[in-house]
Amino acid sequence: MQTIIRVEKLAKTFNQHQALHAVDLNIHHSEMVALLGPSGSGKSTLLRHLSGLITGDKSAGSHIELLGRTVQREGRLARDIRKSRAHTGYIFQQFNLVNRLSVLENVLIGALGSTPFWRTCFSWFTREQKQRALQALTRVGMVHFAHQRVSTLSGGQQQRVAIARALMQQAKVILADEPIASLDPESARIVMDTLRDINQNDGITVVVTLHQVDYALRYCERIVALRQGHVFYDGSSQQFDNERFDHLYRSINRIEENAKAA
């Protein structure tokens, strides 16, 4: 099976606090993987390293590859980082959309990387690009909102627009950082249904950080659980049982209680 993401010996330190400890991870083509763990476990930090939004410590042997290209090595970004980012869609908890633009215009932003610079300065997009943007909106059930200002949408609708933008980008990998954290249960279900649909039908690799274990079990075939910057579990979601859940979360609660008592 083709390896899409490869992480070797990744470490990250913030202000003398080590957030990640020599993490090794391989993610394969068309997998849908959940990164789980309590707050501060390192899951979002790990995700942000995958596309080079942040760099790791200058550790000997640390290396991240995405789509066969080096993203960073020993704490330094690759010179051609834009080439690996070109086919990587990033979905944020806070949507990262331009509120003053329409839904369609926000989706067309996904085409900027493949559009000549002089046309991007004037937002001149071709008829074919606009048609692809409408098709992406159709995929996520948002085509009827194409000409509506994005600021008028609900959180769940905005998140689906962000997914459509990733489709417009022709992403081969989607990295979703807490995409349903601020959504109501129905909106969260629709967003996760949408991610699973494009994973299964388009073969797009999806890596998603989640706090909600039930969504990870329902939607993701594989779980990578982090605890205090270490990979605690990496395997099938079917094997992530109550005992592992308790060990992952209760031990953290016990540490916090002891710290307060001290």
UniProtKB/Swiss-Prot annotation:
GO cellular component: plasma membrane
Occurrences of domain ABC transporter (ranges): 5-253
GO MF term list: ABC-type phosphonate transporter activity; ATP binding; ATP hydrolysis activity
Membrane topology: Peripheral membrane protein
Keyword Membrane: yes
Alphabetized UniProt keyword annotations: ATP-binding, Cell inner membrane, Cell membrane, Membrane, Nucleotide-binding, Phosphonate transport, Translocase, Transport
Pfam family, one: ABC_tran
Subunit organization: The complex is composed of two ATP-binding proteins (PhnC), two transmembrane proteins (PhnE) and a solute-binding protein (PhnD).
Family membership noted in the UniProt record: Belongs to the ABC transporter superfamily. Phosphonates importer (TC 3.A.1.9.1) family.
Protein name per the record: Phosphonates import ATP-binding protein PhnC
